[in-house]
Amino acid sequence: MTISPPEREPKVRVVVDNDPVPTSFEKWAKPGHFDRTLARGPQTTTWIWNLHALAHDFDTHTSDLEDISRKIFSAHFGHLAVVFIWLSGMYFHGAKFSNYEAWLADPTGIKPSAQVVWPIVGQGILNGDVGGGFHGIQITSGLFQLWRASGITNEFQLYCTAIGGLVMAGLMLFAGWFHYHKRAPKLEWFQNVESMLNHHLAGLLGLGSLSWAGHQIHVSLPINKLLDAGVAAKDIPLPHEFILNPSLMAELYPKVDWGFFSGVIPFFTFNWAAYSDFLTFNGGLNPVTGGLWLSDTAHHHLAIAVLFIIAGHMYRTNWGIGHSLKEILEAHKGPFTGAGHKGLYEVLTTSWHAQLAINLAMMGSLSIIVAQHMYAMPPYPYLATDYPTQLSLFTHHMWIGGFLVVGGAAHGAIFMVRDYDPAMNQNNVLDRVLRHRDAIISHLNWVCIFLGFHSFGLYVHNDTMRAFGRPQDMFSDTGIQLQPVFAQWVQNLHTLAPGGTAPNAAATASVAFGGDVVAVGGKVAMMPIVLGTADFMVHHIHAFTIHVTVLILLKGVLFARSSRLIPDKANLGFRFPCDGPGRGGTCQVSGWDHVFLGLFWMYNCISVVIFHFSWKMQSDVWGTVAPDGTVSHITGGNFAQSAITINGWLRDFLWAQASQVIGSYGSALSAYGLLFLGAHFIWAFSLMFLFSGRGYWQELIESIVWAHNKLKVAPAIQPRALSIIQGRAVGVAHYLLGGIATTWAFFLARIISVG
């Protein structure tokens, strides 16, 4: 028998083009240089809208995939530069305008502030007393808690980090220019997924986690141990001293050998018990700070680093060993999936929209998961008792997640219109999903109807029974009980199971599932969250709104290329208002319109989630703890009986808790009162664009132009009404901005007052 040697795969190498695109300020100075029509300059006011719509739509600049890839790659560096500048500004505020050092000395008594308003015409009122004689705006970003966890002990260190951020921003701007104009990677480099996976897994995630674990062990842990013991920040050695002077570490962790080589030997000889002083497995929260044990999180990051460094050696590049992604995908055939994943490798290496759609859906879901974990297992010291920050972080990560998920659907639909090739996808999973899209969408539609009528029906029933004075006939914990038995079972399971599955852990991962109240400075950090009928009912509203959002977004993707109504939809593009005047009922069917409608339902969905969270935590978790251990919650546990009627939500949540923002004038919170009003205005302004006929505006504009002509002051650029799609875009943007800013003002004025 002869064994044929494996086919030699071409070697992977980094290939670039030298000086592919000249650097020309003259070209950049010309608006619309990337588009032949736009470059001619404006004839009508539509030009400025098209300029914004197409500036970053690289697909429309060129059809060359290599050039598009380079533009995206370069734009990523530009994006990172903006992020570094933004972060630098945050750190600079911490260094220059904050009470960080005072907060560090008394984190339970002093509120974080990093912004001081200049009293130009009386705005000084916004500088509230945050304790310790400092007057400023209370911040809710959680940065103080993050800085303490990192081991930052004074404002000079923040100053240095801010400068470091600007240096990094400059480096990123240079890299963005360099990799487009000087050394631009070839298309094959962008399509080399094995090398990318190896580098991202081992380098970015593996070494990234390892360096963070190293920082936590050598800097964060000793500094936080001293802070927790009550040592003043100014008496704590500087971070580099802990690294360079092993005797400092030996004082704090005497069991450990802090020698340069001898300290690493136990890791490779599996004698891991040597590290048990600072790589712990405590579980639960640190009772001093109310945050996760920093020694647990250091342990976690070290473990994650090991896993990802191993993962970064799994894919085959130049050494003939490891996985090939194309082989994995083509071998992946289920019993009911036909050709399975065949063709997906080509899809994901030639369509960046397809790639982006998956990444956005994943990152959005991850952000929502982060929101849930940040309050249940607060990762930083004194975060749990800073209620305004907890509420802000939850709300922030929920909104971000919602937007990213909708973005995933948007780019999924763009992929379908611009990049999908039916000939390449024969009987694979993508093709099969598209072939039975009617079954998928009609089932989803049925689920939405079921959830909508039943969840809303429970509320309507309860409102009616309460109005009739028949509490015994209501769905409630004291009437007809609808206990969330599965959720309670999961809570119980997670409280008991770790005793068997993680016998070395001192406590379960999260107190939210069960356990004792964790109190810091007389405030509840976390305690078991009791679930009842009210939660069961709201949960089904969540299920309803999520399913409707998914229905709209998925329908947009699955019907982006064609539908029974418009079989040639792909030819009309991703966004079009209607299929011409000759056909009725073809408006709002483009991929873009589904994203537009999906955004409203995403907004509905996330709003209910953050309202539920805000009220539930104030009612059943957050509050004060008396010396005898009794807990007094902010709203005294009113959620269970009030959140079961629509009237309860309107009266006991929205109206009752809006009193702080409505009555904020004349106090340091007055900016929130103004924001509340102003954001309502922006929201209402959006309706003008959403309930509008384009022809009305065009007629109005023409009579105004006529008047200008009469007076011989007619403009050279002809004014035109917004197109239908532009009007919708302006409408949805203001709707979301107004709604989110209203919620922000409502939440913060409330929780800063009572939290």
UniProtKB/Swiss-Prot annotation:
At which positions is phylloquinone bound? 697
Q: What subcellular compartments does it reside in?
A: Cellular thylakoid membrane
Positions that bind [4Fe-4S] cluster: 578, 587
Source organism's superkingdom?
Bacteria
Stated membrane topology is: Multi-pass membrane protein
Species annotation: Thermostichus vulcanus
Q: What class of enzyme is it?
A: oxidoreductase
**EC number(s) given by UniProt:** 1.97.1.12
Subunit notes for this chain? The PsaA/B heterodimer binds the P700 chlorophyll special pair and subsequent electron acceptors. PSI consists of a core antenna complex that captures photons, and an electron transfer chain that converts photonic excitation into a charge separation. The cyanobacterial PSI reaction center is composed of one copy each of PsaA,B,C,D,E,F,I,J,K,L,M and X, and forms trimeric complexes.
State the name under which the record lists this protein.
Answer: Photosystem I P700 chlorophyll a apoprotein A1
Keywords, comma-separated and alphabetical: 4Fe-4S, Chlorophyll, Chromophore, Electron transport, Iron, Iron-sulfur, Magnesium, Membrane, Metal-binding, Oxidoreductase, Photosynthesis, Photosystem I, Thylakoid, Transmembrane, Transmembrane helix, Transport
Tell me which Gene Ontology terms the entry assigns under biological process.
Answer: photosynthesis
Free-text comment on the cofactor? PSI electron transfer chain: 5 chlorophyll a, 1 chlorophyll a', 2 phylloquinones and 3 4Fe-4S clusters. PSI core antenna: 90 chlorophyll a, 22 carotenoids, 3 phospholipids and 1 galactolipid. P700 is a chlorophyll a/chlorophyll a' dimer, A0 is one or more chlorophyll a, A1 is one or both phylloquinones and FX is a shared 4Fe-4S iron-sulfur center.
Major localisation? membrane
